[in-house]
Swiss-Prot record:
NCBIfam families assigned: tRNA uracil 4-sulfurtransferase ThiI (TIGR00342)
Family: Belongs to the ThiI family.
Protein name in the entry: Probable tRNA sulfurtransferase
PANTHER family: TRNA SULFURTRANSFERASE (PTHR43209:SF1)
Gene name for this UniProt entry: thiI
Catalytic activity: [ThiI sulfur-carrier protein]-S-sulfanyl-L-cysteine + a uridine in tRNA + 2 reduced [2Fe-2S]-[ferredoxin] + ATP + H(+) = [ThiI sulfur-carrier protein]-L-cysteine + a 4-thiouridine in tRNA + 2 oxidized [2Fe-2S]-[ferredoxin] + AMP + diphosphate; [ThiS sulfur-carrier protein]-C-terminal Gly-Gly-AMP + S-sulfanyl-L-cysteinyl-[cysteine desulfurase] + AH2 = [ThiS sulfur-carrier protein]-C-terminal-Gly-aminoethanethioate + L-cysteinyl-[cysteine desulfurase] + A + AMP + 2 H(+)
Nucleotide-binding recorded as keyword: yes
Binding residue positions for ATP: 185-186, 210-211, 267, 289, 298
Pfam families reported in the protein's UniProt record: ThiI (PF02568), ThiI_fer (PF22025), THUMP (PF02926)
Natural source organism: Nocardia farcinica (strain IFM 10152)
Amino acid sequence: MSGFCVLAKYGEIAVKGRNQGWFENCLVRNLRHAVGGPVLIRRRGGFLVASAHHRDPAELTRRLQEVMGLNVVQPALSVPPTVEDATAAAVDLLRRRHAERPGAPVPTFAVRARRRWKDFPMSSDAFAAHIGARVCAELGWRVDLAAPEVPVLVEVDRREIFVSVERLPGQGGLPVGCSGRALVLLSGGYDSPVAAYRAMRRGLHCDFVHFTGAPYTDPSSMYKAYALARELGRYQTPARLYVVPVGNAQKTLATAGAEELQIVARRRLYLRIAEELARRRQRDALVTGDSLGQVASQTLSNLVSADQACTLPVLRPLIGWDKQEIITEARRIGTAEISVLRDEDCCSLLAPSEVATRTNPADLRVIEQRADIDTLVEQALEHVTVLTPGRVRGAEPPRAKVARPTVVAG
């Protein structure tokens, strides 16, 4: 008796040695969360097998494609470990695949067989040839071993055989959560959501902090940050978004004589607030969307000056990316349609006419002393709003719509 399943194949986890089991456990937890209901997960050498009878096969496959740590996601039929069952399954899969494309020319195919169970009665080549001959006889398809349009993938295990005609890319990287927890400084632009995604891909679970210009700006940037965090929730387990109003603090910095140092002084303020939030929430690092030299505030001198305002590590996954690379990645992961929406953000509030490209931390400390920076940080933290964005569900979420957030305690 055959049944639909998905082969979830990982890459980097396979070289983790004695720690591989721990990484696998983390991956299994994330797979269960991604499916969002009862799912049977079986472990095989080098991959996992996921089955969920209550799920549409295409939906199950799509959800597993969003799980970090998987290199390949392969929908398949699981059949008893006999030559006849596997051959019949291959013919059936190809027949159904062609029926879904009425009017299309008959494609070429090739069978790739692999035996993990070496006591199987046929060699891999002989098994592939046997299945191929049956396909040619029953369906009339042509064989192309060099560049087949449809590869038939057959994997022989001791207890079952997996037959597949599709091999889809996964997200790669490491399972979210296996590298620790971080707090992402999330703006409404292209850069920081992509930085969050890249951090997740290296195993970091990410919460988010967003700074608004309230009470001098409208809540549009908060709604936008909420939508971005919700979209990014497709790739990890539940996270929180902390919204911090810094309009009054920015006004204080502007009147403390910051002038062309104002933007870097703000960045130091944001890092101080984010660091204190991270410490209170037991997060291990901060993540920003900085790209070296992209704008005046992101010169090496200014990044060094900003980092000296905090002691937690500040991770910058996009430090060597150019803007077009970032936008291309944003489109791929689903955040670009939100980032392009207009909003009233804190960066546009009281913006100076010029921004220094080289700054001295000593000069910035003088400005912070005048503004009483510690008091500004405490006042901002007293007005934090905590949101739970959840995650997008469904095949094609309406990404260009910004939902109003849900506020929770804590």
